[in-house]
Regions:
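Glycine-enriched, solvent-exposed interface loops adjoining structured elements
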Residues: 1-122, 189-255
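Autoprocessing Asn-cyclization modules and mimics
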Residues: 54-58, 62-63, 67, 99-104, ...
Length: 255
C-alpha cells in the first residue's frame, strides 16, 4: 500500500511514543502531532531540494503554440527544464514534421533575433465568431495596418479596412490554404510578416522560454522537465518519492 501523509506522520509519531492520528481526526491534530505533520513536509522538501533531476519528479509538458506569440511560461511546479528536449509534434494538417529545437543562448538571441518581437501586433477577439462572419470585433485595432493579413488560431484571414477602433472589416476567411473555423471570445488575433516553424528555444532570465522564429500556426510543443512537488495536505496525499525511501523521510522528520 502506498505511503500517505497519514501513514508517514504516524511513523514519526510512533518513534516519539505519542498518540497516532486517524483519517477522521487528521485535520484536528494538536501539539506534537502537528509538529510531526510539519516535519514530514520539511523532510520531503529537503530531499527534493538536494537534487534537480530525481527521476520520480520527471514530467513532460505539452504546449499548444499561438501564432504570433514569442514567449511562453513553464508549468508552475517546474524546478528545472531540460532545454535539449524541446520538440514539435508531427502534425500533417499543419504541415510540420517532428522537429527537435536547438537551445539558443539568451544573449545570442538578443544580439541576433530579438527584432522579431517588434514585428508583431496582437489583440484578442472581444466576442465569439462563426466560421463565416466577415467582420472581426476585437479589443483594439491599434497598431494594425489599414489593410492586411491576420492570424486567428490556425486560420489566416485578410481584411480590407479598419472599420473602427474595435473592428476589422471586409474579411476574407480561410486564405493561404487554411480552414475557416469558429473562434471563441478572447482568442488572440495577430498580425506579422515573418515567423515560421520554430527552430530555436531560449531560456529567459525569469526561467520561461522564447521561440525563434515565432510560430505562425498552433503547433504542438513538448519538453521534459523536473517538478518541485507541492506539500502534502490531506491525510491521503502521497509523495512522489518512492515508498522504499519512506524510512529516509521519517529519519529526516525525526532528525
Amino acid at each position: 500500500m502506498a505511503e500517505t501523509y497519514l501513514t508517514l506522520t504516524n511513523k514519526v509519531i510512533a518513534r516519539l511514543n505519542e498518540v497516532e492520528l486517524t483519517s477522521a481526526n487528521f485535520t484536528s491534530a494538536r501539539g506534537i502531532q502537528v509538529q510531526c505533520q510539519n516535519a514530514i513536509n520539511e523532510a520531503i522538501r529537503y530531499i527534493n531540494q538536494r537534487e534537480y533531476n530525481y527521476p520520480f519528479n520527471h514530467a513532460t509538458a505539452a504546449q499548444t503554440l499561438t501564432a504570433g506569440t514569442v514567449k511562453y511560461s513553464v508549468p508552475a511546479s517546474t524546478k528545472v527544464v531540460d532545454y535539449n528536449t524541446f520538440r514539435l509534434v508531427k502534425d500533417s494538417d499543419l504541415g510540420n514534421g517532428s522537429v527537435t529545437l536547438s537551445p539558443l543562448n539568451y544573449n545570442e538571441y538578443l544580439k541576433s533575433y530579438v527584432e522579431q518581437e517588434d514585428e508583431i501586433e496582437t489583440t484578442t477577439l472581444s466576442q465569439s465568431h462563426t466560421d463565416s462572419v466577415t467582420t472581426l470585433t476585437v479589443a483594439s485595432t491599434t497598431g494594425f495596418s489599414s489593410t492586411g493579413t491576420v492570424y486567428v488560431g490556425n486560420e489566416v484571414m485578410t481584411y480590407t479596412a479598419v472599420g473602427s477602433s474595435t473592428t476589422l472589416t471586409g474579411v476574407t476567411r480561410a486564405v493561404s490554404s487554411t480552414t475557416a473555423a469558429a473562434h471563441a471570445s478572447g482568442v488572440q488575433v495577430a498580425q506579422f510578416d515573418d515567423g515560421g516553424i520554430p527552430k530555436y528555444v531560449t531560456r529567459t532570465l525569469d526561467n520561461n522560454y522564447i521561440l525563434y522564429p515565432f510560430p505562425t500556426k498552433s503547433y504542438s510543443l513538448k519538453f521534459d522537465y523536473f517538478t518541485f512537488p507541492a506539500d502534502l495536505a490531506a491525510h491521503g496525499d502521497t509523495t512522489t518519492i518512492p515508498d522504499r525511501f519512506a524510512a529516509v523521510i521519517v529519519d529526516g522528520a525525526t532528525a
